[in-house]
Amino acid sequence: MTLSAYLALALILFCIGLYGALTKRNTVIVLICIELMLNAVNINFVAFAKYGAHPGVHGHVFALFAIAIAAAEAAVGLAALIAFYRNRKTVQVDEANSLKH
């Protein structure tokens, strides 16, 4: 595969994730779409590390670091979602605007 193929794949994944994050009402689906967007960025990091002007492992290391950060973000997001569900008995984004008791 060439660099443009990887970039096209990352663009498609990012656009799917952005569409889902902006249009879906379920918070779990929104979190999954955000993770999809982060994975598209990781594909770019690895592709530029392989096909860039100075190939090296820096892109791979940065992608692994981004995956670790994304895992922590997903854990915090799901913990907040569980707390929200216990309070409101729903996971809809529309209900998140009224977080007062």
UniProtKB/Swiss-Prot annotation:
Record keywords, A-Z: Cell membrane, Membrane, NAD, Quinone, Translocase, Transmembrane, Transmembrane helix, Transport
Catalytic activity entry: a quinone + NADH + 5 H(+)(in) = a quinol + NAD(+) + 4 H(+)(out)
EC number: 7.1.1.-
Domain of life of the source: Bacteria
Subcellular location field: Cell membrane
Regions crossing the membrane: 2-22, 28-48, 62-82
Disulfide bridges in this chain: none
Alphabetical list of Pfam families matching this protein: Oxidored_q2
Main localisation: membrane
InterPro entries: NADH_UbQ_OxRdtase_chain4L/K, NUOK/Mnh_C1-like
Topological type in the membrane: Multi-pass membrane protein
Biological-process GO terms, alphabetical: ATP synthesis coupled electron transport
Entry GO MF terms: NADH:ubiquinone reductase (non-electrogenic) activity; quinone binding
Gene Ontology cellular-component annotations: NADH dehydrogenase complex; plasma membrane
Family matches, as NCBIfam families: PRK05715.1-2, PRK05715.1-3, PRK05715.1-4, PRK05715.1-5
Quaternary structure, from the entry: NDH-1 is composed of 14 different subunits. Subunits NuoA, H, J, K, L, M, N constitute the membrane sector of the complex.
Function in brief: NDH-1 shuttles electrons from NADH, via FMN and iron-sulfur (Fe-S) centers, to quinones in the respiratory chain. The immediate electron acceptor for the enzyme in this species is believed to be a menaquinone. Couples the redox reaction to proton translocation (for every two electrons transferred, four hydrogen ions are translocated across the cytoplasmic membrane), and thus conserves the redox energy in a proton gradient.
Similarity-based family: Belongs to the complex I subunit 4L family.
Name used for this protein in its record: NADH-quinone oxidoreductase subunit K
Gene: nuoK
